[in-house]
Regions:
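Non-catalytic, well-ordered alpha-helical scaffold segments
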Residues: 51, 74-81, 108, 134, ...
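Short, amphipathic alpha-helical interaction segments positioned at domain boundaries
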Residues: 132-158
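A short, conserved structural fragment
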Residues: 115-125
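C-terminal scaffold of the Radical SAM
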Residues: 1-101, 151-158
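Short secondary-structure transition/capping segments
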Residues: 15-19, 117-118, 135
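Minor-groove-contacting beta-hairpin "wing" of winged helix-turn-helix DNA-binding domains
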Residues: 126-130
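Short amphipathic alpha-helical interaction segments
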Residues: 100-116
Length: 158
């Protein structure tokens, strides 16, 4: 068995390909009560109530109740913290291809600081968690949450 994701192990050739789509940001459609979808930069969530689901207007996406448009910051955050769950980590070139900015342009010194503290490593194009980084993964991933200037201002005045 080998570890292919922070909380998943598998025999060679048996890693879950289904979940890999979530961790790499592939768009997906969910059907049924309480299902979630990620389509066209929007996260959808279906109702959990059968009656509401069955009587949904035809123009609704299979009875969705919530639609949350994702900002580019939302998508960059998810790219980083979902990608860092995987032992393969995140690719600098894939980040740049997807967002037209480098990880350093977006996150400044954060990756280098995490590397200096032994929580993150870089090999070639990829950043990935070290064994100690896996133990402190919530902290590491929280470092990749982008705070808008409005949130920063509110935080300063609170």
């Amino acid at each position: 068995m080998y570890r292919y994701e922070i909380s998943n192990y598998a025999k060679p050739g048996f890693a879950c390909r289904h979940n890999d789509g979530y961790w790499t940001g592939v768009w997906y459609a969910g059907f049924g009560l309480g299902a979630s979808s990620l389509l066209n930069h929007t996260r959808y969530r279906n109702t959990e109530h059968m009656e509401e689901y069955l009587t949904a207007a035809p123009e609704q996406l299979a009875g969705y109740r919530e639609a949350e448009p994702l900002t580019q910051n939302d998508e960059m955050e998810e790219f980083m913290f979902l990608g860092l769950r995987r032992m393969a980590g995140v690719s600098e070139s894939e980040f740049k291809k997807r967002f037209r900015r480098t990880i350093r342009e977006v996150y400044g010194e954060i990756p280098d600081s995490l590397i200096r503290h032994g929580l993150l490593a870089r090999k070639g194009d990829r950043y990935f968690l070290t064994p100690e980084g896996m133990n402190l993964s919530n902290y590491v991933m929280s470092e990749f949450i982008l705070i808008s200037s409005e949130q920063q201002q509110k935080h300063r005045t609170d």
